[in-house]
Amino acid sequence: MANDQKVRVGGRELNVSNLDKVLYPATGTTKADVMRYYQAVADVLVPQVRRRPVTRKRWPEGVDRQSFFRKDLEDSAPEWIPTATIQHTTSVNVYPLIDGSATLAWLSQVAAIELHTPQWRFGEDGAPRNPDRLVLDLDPGPGVALRDTAEVALWCREILEDMGLTCVPVTSGS
């Protein structure tokens, strides 16, 4: 790998490369910047995704180039990345699980910029548990301002909090 380095993150050693590769050309944001961002948000992000299988959307040459989705754990992944297996209708996939900042650092190393997780987690026994979150995907349609969508989100929050549920806003940026 070009510009190989070993870094220590979250108590783990990780091989990284091409940290100066620009992943967001419009802003000049590099792989190292994405890695720093993932580390900055780890304390908030990890509890939300812990023990959830993660499908990754990767942009190895930057967001202005071809992307692809990846379910199975990459062959090059460090052995310390926790995994879980899901039997789908036509295939068996071994997914990585995010358990800390080191896994997030590895995800940034492979340019996994979008992280997709289901509404459920694996239990300590390795079996899928019941869903533990609800996602309301609010997208403004034609002629609808983002401000209107935000107002609907506030109404949803009020209703859900009245039901005793904890609300966590998430934006995708798309």
For every predicted segment, state its role.
Residues 2-13, 35, 40-142, 146, ...:
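SsDNA-processing nucleotidyl-transfer enzymes
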Residues 15-27:
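Acidic, metal-coordinating catalytic segment for phosphate/diphosphate chemistry
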Residues 24, 46, 50, 161:
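Hydrophobic/aromatic-lined pockets within catalytic cores
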Residues 30-33:
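Short, structural beta-strand-to-alpha-helix junction motif
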Residues 155-163:
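Generic non-transmembrane alpha-helical segments
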Residues 164-169:
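A short linear hydrophobic-aromatic micro-motif
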Residues 171-174:
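Short, conserved phosphate-binding/catalytic loop or strand-edge motifs used
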